Amino acid sequence: MMFFRYSFSQFLIFCLLIFPSCKRSTIRESIDMKWRVVQNDIGNNIFLYEGHNPDVPLRAWAVLIPLEDNQIRILVSDDKDGVSTTSQMSSKLGASVIINGGYFFRGQTPIRHVGLLKSQDSLYEPASNSVYRDNIKYKTNRGAFGIYHDNSVNIAWASTRNDSIFCWSSPFKNRPGKPASINYSLSKFWNVKEAIHAGPILLRNKALIVSSEQEVFFNTPVVGVQPRSAIGYKKNGDVVMMVVDGRQVVSRGVYLKELAMLMKQFDCEVALNLDGGGSSSLVVNGELVNNPIGLKSEREVMSFVAIIPK
């Protein structure tokens, strides 16, 4: 009976969010995104872009950030329950730009991050070195975003051993039903002060790679059409953060390959998929710029990547 407490318009919005289309979408081989600068007064040479494509349809936002003028940080919620909204973290830290970070286990007490999480030289969670699919154990070195002590950044396939972080130049060669073995002799010590696992990696040397199978994301919602968050960097070190709305009439969301194409449009050398779905949120100067699952409300998450003015 509680259903009738809601108005017809609210019910209609709910239906549109849950059932935006009966037609199965296919992966686009190219997306002609119309990008334009919508904010250039953020400070420290940061630019916010808005993009749309009515044919897919898609709506997305990207922020271009030069690190010589800005400090980049990985943040962890300090709330009692271990999660905060992106806007709450922006307000606490005075961040000029902040985006949601990695995956986490919702409903656990205490809440736990899925894989590597390191902030201010403190290791909150080691890497998840293995996952199970159909009762088969796969060793993993999933994509991670790392920040060095000099404020430069890197994206690599990473894992941990005895609380030390190691990185590889390529992912383990996992395939469905065919797990790979782990080889630390091919890795190197990753001396980063902050790092966060998410994945999969989308771009490497500007090439679309989308290592979802190797990182063992097969048979998960990660590989489907979703609202998305991503982070990458250009050859000159400038960072690009992006969110793509999804599950809406005006924006269906994107496949991982499509997200890689959008990041490449900003000349990213390397790019990483972050936690998506209803977690995708981008806040600029304290304002939420996107519409998570069609609503101007935010899901609480555990980790974030933020830009703090120097």
Residue spans for each PLM region:
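Alpha/propeptide regions of enzymes that mature by internal proteolysis
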Residues: L272-L274
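Conserved, well-ordered active-site substructure
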Residues: Q108-R133, E213-V270, S279-K310
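Zymogen propeptides
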Residues: K23-T160
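Active-site-adjacent helix-turn-beta-strand microarchitecture at beta-sheet edges
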Residues: T109-E213, T220
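Short acidic-glycine loop/turn motifs at beta-strand connectors
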Residues: P66-D69, G146-S152, L203-K206, Y233-G237, ...
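Short glycine-rich loop/turn motifs
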Residues: L58-A62, R142, H197-G199, Q226-A230, ...
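Bacterial Sec-dependent N-terminal signal peptides
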Residues: M1-E29
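A short catalytic or substrate-binding loop motif that flags glycine-/basic-rich loops and adjacent residues
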Residues: P54-P57, I136-K139, E194, P221-V225, ...
